[in-house]
Curated annotation (Swiss-Prot):
One of its GO terms (molecular function) is structural constituent of ribosome. It comes from Campylobacter jejuni subsp. jejuni serotype O:23/36 (strain 81-176). Binds to the 23S rRNA. Belongs to the bacterial ribosomal protein bL9 family. It comes from the Bacteria. Keywords: Ribonucleoprotein, Ribosomal protein, RNA-binding, rRNA-binding. This is Large ribosomal subunit protein bL9. InterPro entries: Ribosomal_bL9, Ribosomal_bL9/RNase_H1_N, Ribosomal_bL9_bac/chp, Ribosomal_bL9_C, Ribosomal_bL9_C_sf, Ribosomal_bL9_N, Ribosomal_bL9_N_sf.
Amino acid sequence: MKVLLIKDVKALGKAGEVKEVKDGYGQNFLIAKGFAKAATNEVLKKYESDKKKEAENLRFEIANLEKLKEELSKITLEISKPVGANGSLFGGVTKDEIAHALKEQSHIEIDKKSLECDTFKSLGLHEVSVKLGHAIHAKFNINIKAE
């Protein structure tokens, strides 16, 4: 019997492969446990169709991330913080403050966990890197000013 593997099966193959197996193994184990489906023409066509849709969605998502990367590269956020008598910041600028300023000033929401920077403790222009997903990274600037 031919089966289409839905999940990786040790010593048999990876998800998406069509394998020839004994009827009992296919029916009583692979199909019963949800590791595979019988490889009929309809199942194979649906699998190919789903794979094409998934690839199209991935291309669309990557295109949107590239567009966001381009938008972010043009941004310079302005953040005002109180400073001490010697000109140093009180506490610094955190990822949370950067994410909030990005949302307020540019209407772009980014999770603070995707920001790749430490707390900034000095005034001036700083570069912030953002992990957008699918190995796409963007950079934008923040300008920290005294209040």
